């Protein structure tokens, strides 16, 4: 059995990112993880978010490094175990760096977040839990729907491109990922002002939104406890990542899941098991189509029956008239014969 386990490679998936320090410490963490497996075969696969979601629906890896929004959904619906959260260097609490800071141009007259509803807002194309989804969480917590508040969203490939669009007046505001404002060059920062900046005890950076765990390591329920402990021991005691942060005890993902549920996030739709209500809702159009066809057939049937009755009545009426004419003819013929006979008798008597 252990030989079979050794021959079967341990699958490690990681979410690929293009911005921020996670593009360095997540692949390095995956290297450390497979290094702890000894002579066990392994396979590391890297996917961007759409690919990862698609693959996870059909293939459950042993370990996965991902943003905590996907982590919360995997924990909830695929029963993955949340092993560790990544505590960023600028964070003072386990994994609590996933927030967003909304910035506006220095000369903008926008006073608060509510005024941004429906305006043109920039976001990073790559940002998930940090940045975009925390901003969505903030708007939905205030009673807005995602569709109404973020009606005119524009995606940018990097912060610089987005900030330049903001300064040029192409967009009204920009959603920055947690701590990205502090990393901007001073020249750029001087042309901006944070909207509703808040200071949280968990981080040394400003934020507009609540903070959530950022990166998570999760293990499949089929991974043996012994292997989980080996991986935990390796990553928690590793100092090689200290430039970026460290892996710590898992921060709860309940609030992340609640945010996704509240804002009707598409991840919920991707992984939530279907209920009878969902199936009925999905079937509403085909069912309506079938009912309309049946109703059409019923109406057609009624019209055909009505037409048949009408035609039958016309035929009956025609026959009745024909019989009446025939009867008249018979009477006339009878009268004619009697008249002729009478004439003949009278003629004979003469």
Enumerate the language-model features and the residues they cover.
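Pocket-lining segment of extracytoplasmic ligand-binding domains
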Residues: 120-223
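Conserved HAMP-HisKA connector
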Residues: 321-350
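Extended ligand-binding regions for polar small-molecule ligands
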Residues: 27-37, 107, 191-264
């Amino acid at each position: 059995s252990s030989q079979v386990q050794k021959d079967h490679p341990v699958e490690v998936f990681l979410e690929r990112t293009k911005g921020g320090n996670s593009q360095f410490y997540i692949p390095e963490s995956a290297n450390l993880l497979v290094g702890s497996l000894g002579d066990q075969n392994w396979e590391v696969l890297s996917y961007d978010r759409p690919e990862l979601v698609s693959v996870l629906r059909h293939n459950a890896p042993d370990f996965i490094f991902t943003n905590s929004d996907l982590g919360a959904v995997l924990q909830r619906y695929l029963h993955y175990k949340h092993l560790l959260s990544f505590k960023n260097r600028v964070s003072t609490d386990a994994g609590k760096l996933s927030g967003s800071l909304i910035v506006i141009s220095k000369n903008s007259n926008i006073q608060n977040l509510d005024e941004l509803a429906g305006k043109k807002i920039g976001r990073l194309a790559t940002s998930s839990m940090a940045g975009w989804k925390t901003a969505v969480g903030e708007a939905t917590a205030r009673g807005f729907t995602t569709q109404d508040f973020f009606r005119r969203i524009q995606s940018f490939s990097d912060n610089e491109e987005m900030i330049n669009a903001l300064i040029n007046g192409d967009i009204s505001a920009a959603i920055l990922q947690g701590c990205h404002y502090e990393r901007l060059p001073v020249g750029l920062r001087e042309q901006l002002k944070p909207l509703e900046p808040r200071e949280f005890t968990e981080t040394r950076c400003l934020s507009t939104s609540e903070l959530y765990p950022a990166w998570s390591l999760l293990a499949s329920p089929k991974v043996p406890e012994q292997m989980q402990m080996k991986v935990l021991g390796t990553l928690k005691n590793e100092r090689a990542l200290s430039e970026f942060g460290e892996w710590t005890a898992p921060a709860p993902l309940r609030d992340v899941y609640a945010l996704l549920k509240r804002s009707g996030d598409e991840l919920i739709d991707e992984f939530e098991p279907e209920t009878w209500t969902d199936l009925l809702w999905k079937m509403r159009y085909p069912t309506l189509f079938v009912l309309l066809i049946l109703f059409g057939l019923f109406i057609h049937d009624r019209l055909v029956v009505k037409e048949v009755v009408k035609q039958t009545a016309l035929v009956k009426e025609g026959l009745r008239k024909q019989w009446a004419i025939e009867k008249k003819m018979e009477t006339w013929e009878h009268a004619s014969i009697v008249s002729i006979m009478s004439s003949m008798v009278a003629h004979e008597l003469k």
